[in-house]
């Protein structure tokens, strides 16, 4: 049993109101295949539709234009290689949304950077120090990504507002709405 499953089961056993909602397997799909499945929906509507159906998905190849001429989501051309990245999303019934938990990818190399700068219409960035170093192979190849720690806490604890798991200064109107709904912000 992996750590996530142990953690998940521990929370479900300790807090009766928390029910198991993650599927056993994650669905892997490219952004183009997702567009092909739901061509009449917006990218965000597609994400919702697939996570509602599958529970958890890894959407791959985000950033470049799809067959429709529209990218699935915006991604900087000098960050991830658009053919080697993706997002993990889960269906979150508390808010009835597709909740992104992580975004990751293999960073651009000299070839993907040149191609993506061209596709994005910003080849002038090739002269910037970081981009130039990549194009001249002066930097190592890397991977990266992030985990939305507060979003994961929201998900496991079934909270309705990020302010229930993350301390911040919230505008008065947000505090008032939260209070009206019985949500205690940190």
Model regions and ranges:
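Extended, charged alpha-beta segments that form solvent-exposed binding/catalytic grooves
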Residues: 1-45
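A translation/RNA-centric and nucleic-acid-associated enzymatic feature enriched
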Residues: 28-186
């Amino acid at each position: 049993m992996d750590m996530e499953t142990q953690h998940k089961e521990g929370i479900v056993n300790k807090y009766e109101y928390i029910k198991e909602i993650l599927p056993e397997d994650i669905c892997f799909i490219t952004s183009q295949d997702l567009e092909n499945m739901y061509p009449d929906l917006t990218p965000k509507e597609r994400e919702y539709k697939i996570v509602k159906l599958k529970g958890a998905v890894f959407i791959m190849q985000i950033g470049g234009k799809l067959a429709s001429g529209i990218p699935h989501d915006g991604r900087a051309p000098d960050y991830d290689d658009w053919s080697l990245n993706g997002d993990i999303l889960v269906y979150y019934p508390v808010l009835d949304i597709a909740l992104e938990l992580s975004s990751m990818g293999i960073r651009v190399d000299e070839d993907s950077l040149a191609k993506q700068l061209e596709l994005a219409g910003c080849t002038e960035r090739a002269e910037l120090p970081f981009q130039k170093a990549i194009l001249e192979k002066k930097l190592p190849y890397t991977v990266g990504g992030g985990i939305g720690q507060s979003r994961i806490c929201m998900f496991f604890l079934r909270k309705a507002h990020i302010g229930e798991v993350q301390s911040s200064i919230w505008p008065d109107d947000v505090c008032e709405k939260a209070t009206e709904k019985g949500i205690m912000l940190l």
